[in-house]
Amino acid sequence: MSGACREVVTLQLGHYSNFIGTHWWNLQDAGLVYDADVPAGELQSDVLFREGLTLAGHVTYTPRLIAIDLKGSLQTLRKEGSLYDTENENSAFTWDGQIMTHQESPPSKNSFLQELDNLDTGGVLAESDFNHLTSSVDNCSVPGASVAVETINSSLERIQKSYRLEGSVRVWSDFLRLHLHPRTISVINQYNHDGESERLEVFGQGEALLQGQVLEDLEDRLHFFIEECDYLQGFQVLCDLTDGFSGLGSKVTEYLQDSYGGRGILTWGVAPVNHPDTSSMKDLYHMMNCALGTLQMANHSSLFCPLTLRGGLCRRPPPPTAFPLLNCDPLLWYHSSSVLALALDALTVSYRMRHCSATMWQLSDALTTSGRKVVSAYGSVPFPMMLGGCLPDALDAFSNAVPWRSLSACPEISDRRFCFSQSVTLKGVDEQSLVSRLLPGMEAPSPLHYERSGEDVLSAYVRSHYPSSPLAVQLVSSGSKVTPPFPQIFSPSLSAQGFLQSHSTPASPSCPPVSCLPVLTSLQSSPAVGLQLSELQRACASLDLRRVAPSFLTHGPEHAEISEYLEQLRNLAHCYRQSHSRSSSEEDDDD
């Protein structure tokens, strides 16, 4: 049974969080179907979206979202959005003297935003922007997923045009494809997004922000979205981990825990591979912010998970995570955030399903036993499966290797066959392809081909690698729709549906781009998390901040408090130890 819709409020804190969030909301928006005759999908969009009315009586469907960023971060996007006309409101004017008006030219919009505006006002794109209107777009394995009426969604889905926004994306609003509610965007004017002065760089600055007007503004926005919820299940928080937003996120999650106890708080601490205009001192700041933010947000959340393509969270990390079927530039935020958004789309499936969903607190309770509130994410983006193939064949192709790579900067461990618990999700493989198509009398290539359901196939495969771990499995046949403005970062060996082809297809105007992807993810509590936390704690504890970075202490916490926090981080890392997984270096830490 589907049961009642359990709503979620999303908070995005920081610029990179909003990069990931923008891609993630674009993916959700692309999956919406506006035809009432089409059967309801597997994912319940009302969990994330809210229905409303404009002053003119028009029905709106917008994210239940609070997005916080700094002054100068919006560019062409109005803070109040464009659903409600606020420019024509009359203002009382009492000055009788001479008035001089200075008009500043607005920032220019890229080609995607210009054409989106044209569609939004009822315009039609040029005929050259379309390529075989009805034949080139696949419906990502969802029966009847075509849109019967012309909408912005259906128009964007049919556009066979590569915008190549890599050179024009400066901020996250440069590729935002959906409308936001006027209560969504909150700008912190005390700090600048760009420039050399008034930057939000250290943990203590962020901690000190959540008071006065900033706190009142957050409370008002939360009350607005929460009061209209019938069955609020909790909050999903995306928070920048490497700058001062880690301190703000610590205070925001603490406020949510104190004010809405019993609701789930799933926090994703996000970090880009690189930062513009970085330096050795800023790299030190980034590492300290990661350590303090991880500890504090884990303390105040039901579950905390780092989400990044970085190879590690310390100052000199290994190379970033790469996926063989993606031509992704990890240094480009527009690219790296799109990969993380695809993974997040699958990682959050369990509490968004229409039927047999697990609530946020059920997911967190299963993964965070014995005080292990930090978990790690892994993904196969996209999941490599042959066009026309089956899931058992795709999994067998990995042989003894696991099919995913780290999305949490976790180190490799010698014994990968153990984890405390995990939740695995596969999106984008239709029901007919989940099991083997063996004819009677045929010998099965592997035990997976004997399984009779997709859940059994995936469970059997995962248990072969993690034989003693509690496991939850979710399957969703609809893939992630990567229509414009998602970057075309995909290997030419992928079909339009995101599956492997026997022969690579060179890019050409006659070949439709990839419009849908299968994705496999795993959310794990494992000893690898303990190794990561230990490495981060040791690197931070080895620094004498009073000597090498006294400016980090200017806004707090004090040096003694930081020492106490690092000791708590060390104790948290110890929670992930098992006698059979200890290394000699870890044993030394016990002394």
From Swiss-Prot:
The gene is msto1. InterPro entries: DML1/Misato, DML1/Misato_tubulin, Misato_II_tubulin-like, Tubulin/FtsZ_GTPase_sf. PANTHER family: MITOCHONDRIAL DISTRIBUTION REGULATOR MISATO, PROTEIN MISATO HOMOLOG 1. One of its GO terms (biological process) is mitochondrion organization. This is Protein misato homolog 1. One of its GO terms (cellular component) is mitochondrial outer membrane. It comes from the Eukaryota. Involved in the regulation of mitochondrial distribution and morphology. Required for mitochondrial fusion and mitochondrial network formation. Pfam families: Misat_Tub_SegII, Tubulin_3. Belongs to the misato family. SUPFAM superfamilies: Tubulin nucleotide-binding domain-like. It comes from Danio rerio (Zebrafish).
